[in-house]
Amino acid sequence: MGQKIHPTGFRLAVSRNWASRWYANNNNFAAMLQEDIGVREYLKKKLKNASVGRVVIERPAKNARITIFSSRPGVVIGKKGEDIELLKTELQRRMGVPVHVNIEEIRKPETDAQLIADSITQQLERRIMFRRAMKRAMQNAMRLGAQGIKIMSAGRLNGIEIARTEWYREGRVPLHTLRADIDYATSEAKTTYGIIGVKVWVYKGDTLGRNDAPVVEEVAEDKRPRRNARPGDRRPRRDGEGGAPGARRGAPRRGAGKPEDGKTGE
């Protein structure tokens, strides 16, 4: 099932965190969720050229904190911070509460799944061959530290009449392993022949918990080596196995005692 389920939803509360971090009762949940969806669609359209990887929305105490992860933070902020002030004003109007906007820079955009998918779709819209775009993205990701990447494109590739699906993979992408840090994203290319869908999986290594800490194997208490133990040491004796080291354990073999009268051993 790891091949079918959404990789992010499969790992929520295990190795991934939610993109919307707030709590609401049953009466307000639907309205707040609809607000989040509208904000994400607005930011995706407004910051189309800013290389936005993901958006995290938090709602602490009748406020809203929106964190935008972008590889081009200068485009989001604008000249002297003008663009971000206009953005903040529009978000406050949409959400109805004071909004704080934070910008986080993505250091390695070549290994971010959303940015890879968006880059491929932009190339497809410019009529670049899909194989060339996919292989170039895979090479850049592996060169900058990704342990594995898989890219899938589906639709009327190169304008053919019958739609098909093609995918390429490099490295390893363990979708069943919960501790594996799998970054997954999708994007759509709107071409003259129709829509081409792009899916990207990027394996960045194993994590422990939601803080992206490295996995450290703990040694169990009963498996810890003894302080002065050596490889050639004897195993501990069981009860009833005392005696000298050369003593024979257990009952003597039958006929192994004194020879009977009139018989001598040969």
From Swiss-Prot:
It comes from the Bacteria. One of its GO terms (biological process) is translation. Residues 39-107 form the KH type-2 domain. Pfam families: KH_2, Ribosomal_S3_C. Residues 230-241, 257-266 have a biased composition (Basic and acidic residues). Residues 218-266 are annotated as: Disordered. Transmembrane segments: none annotated. InterPro entries: KH_dom, KH_dom-like_a/b, KH_dom_type_2, KH_sf_prok-type, Ribosomal_S3_C_sf, Ribosomal_uS3_bac-typ, Ribosomal_uS3_C, Ribosomal_uS3_CS. Keywords: Ribonucleoprotein, Ribosomal protein, RNA-binding, rRNA-binding. One of its GO terms (cellular component) is cytosolic small ribosomal subunit. One of its GO terms (molecular function) is structural constituent of ribosome. Belongs to the universal ribosomal protein uS3 family. Binds the lower part of the 30S subunit head. Binds mRNA in the 70S ribosome, positioning it for translation. Part of the 30S ribosomal subunit. Forms a tight complex with proteins S10 and S14. This is Small ribosomal subunit protein uS3.
